[in-house]
């Protein structure tokens, strides 16, 4: 659960950090209506991607890193685009929220959330390689982790 602390701190900063002190409350991304609406659309897209990925996983889904009995390697739907689409959706929603709010607190929280997700996905990948050594290694060669064609 090493990934829990950074995401909790990052989530707290995003949710409440701009209320904690003047430096965290400083708006560094100017409020531009088009940018705010872009953030809203990105947030909705990230949420939709998370939901699609969650339903695609079906019974394989778990909130903690574990394999279930009869666990299958899912490589279709959003998993054909990225290996960790739920994290892609969450990061998209997080970045969108930072764009809309524009406060230092969100910008400080962003790397914490990214590090937390990165730690967790590395742990998941280790487990998947142990369970599906050949299949997952081939999947890793074909599909990027969280940003299609890039990362």
Residue locations for each model-derived region?
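Membrane-anchoring alpha-helices and their flanking helix-loop junctions
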Residues: 1-69, 75, 92-151
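Solvent-exposed interhelical
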Residues: 71-82, 86-87
């Amino acid at each position: 659960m090493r990934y829990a602390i950074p995401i909790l701190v990052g989530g707290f900063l995003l949710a409440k950090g701009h209320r904690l002190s003047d430096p965290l409350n400083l708006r560094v991304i100017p409020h531009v209506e088009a940018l705010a609406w872009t953030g809203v659309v990105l947030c909705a897209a990230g949420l939709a991607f998370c939901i699609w990925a969650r339903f695609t996983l079906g019974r394989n889904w778990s909130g903690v890193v574990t394999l279930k009995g009869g666990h299958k390697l899912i490589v279709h739907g959003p998993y054909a685009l990225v290996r960790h689409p739920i994290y892609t959706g969450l990061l998209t929603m997080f970045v969108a929220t930072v764009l809309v709010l524009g406060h230092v607190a969100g910008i400080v929280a962003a790397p914490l959330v990214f590090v937390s997700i990165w730690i967790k996905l590395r742990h998941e990948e280790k487990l998947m390689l142990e369970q599906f050594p050949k299949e997952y290694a081939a999947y890793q060669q074909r599909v990027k982790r969280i940003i299609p064609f890039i990362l």
